[in-house]
Amino acid sequence: MRLAGVNLPLNKHAVIALTHVYGIGRTSAENILRKAGIAYDKKISELSDEEAHAIREIIAEEYKVEGQARGEQQTAIKRLMDIGCYRGLRHRRSLPVRGQRTRTNARTRKGKRKTVAGKKKAVKK
C-alpha cells in the first residue's frame, strides 16, 4: 500500500507501518487507526480498500506529513537563524542546540574530526 508517497511494508501491523511515514509517530498512528475504526494489530496487507481510503482521508485532513512536515521544520530553523537567537547561531555553526557539552562528544552534529596541528617541539642541540 502506498501512502503519502511512501510504500508501507505489507507484512507489518498497521500501527507500526504507519510510522514509516515522516511526520507520523506511534501515538499519531494509534489515533489515526482509532478514528478509522481499524484494529492496531491488523496487517497492512489485510486492509480493505475502504479502510485504506479512510486512513488516507484522515491523514490528508489532519496531519502534515512527508514534504510538508520537512518544509515546515526547515522554515522554523531558518527563522531561528534569521533572527539571530542563540538556537539559530548553534544551528548555523552545526553545533548541538540543546545545551550538550562540546569539548568532547557531539560528533554527530560536528561531523568528522578535523585535526589541528599542535605545537612544534624544539630541536635539542
UniProtKB/Swiss-Prot annotation:
Keyword tags: Ribonucleoprotein, Ribosomal protein, RNA-binding, rRNA-binding, tRNA-binding
PROSITE patterns per the UniProt record, alphabetical: RIBOSOMAL_S13_1, RIBOSOMAL_S13_2
UniProt cross-references to InterPro entries, sorted A to Z: Rbsml_uS13_C, Ribosomal_uS13, Ribosomal_uS13-like_H2TH, Ribosomal_uS13_bac-type, Ribosomal_uS13_CS
Keyword tRNA-binding attached: yes
Positions of region (Disordered): 94-125
GO CC, one annotated term: small ribosomal subunit
Any Pfam family matching the protein: Ribosomal_S13
GO molecular function, one term: rRNA binding
Superkingdom of the source species: Bacteria
GO biological process: translation
Record has Ribonucleoprotein as a keyword: yes
Similarity comment text for this entry: Belongs to the universal ribosomal protein uS13 family.
Subunit structure: Part of the 30S ribosomal subunit. Forms a loose heterodimer with protein S19. Forms two bridges to the 50S subunit in the 70S ribosome.
Functional description taken from the UniProt entry: Located at the top of the head of the 30S subunit, it contacts several helices of the 16S rRNA. In the 70S ribosome it contacts the 23S rRNA (bridge B1a) and protein L5 of the 50S subunit (bridge B1b), connecting the 2 subunits; these bridges are implicated in subunit movement. Contacts the tRNAs in the A and P-sites.
PANTHER family linked: 30S RIBOSOMAL PROTEIN S13/40S RIBOSOMAL PROTEIN S18, SMALL RIBOSOMAL SUBUNIT PROTEIN US13M
Name the record gives this protein: Small ribosomal subunit protein uS13
Species for this entry: Chlorobium chlorochromatii (strain CaD3)
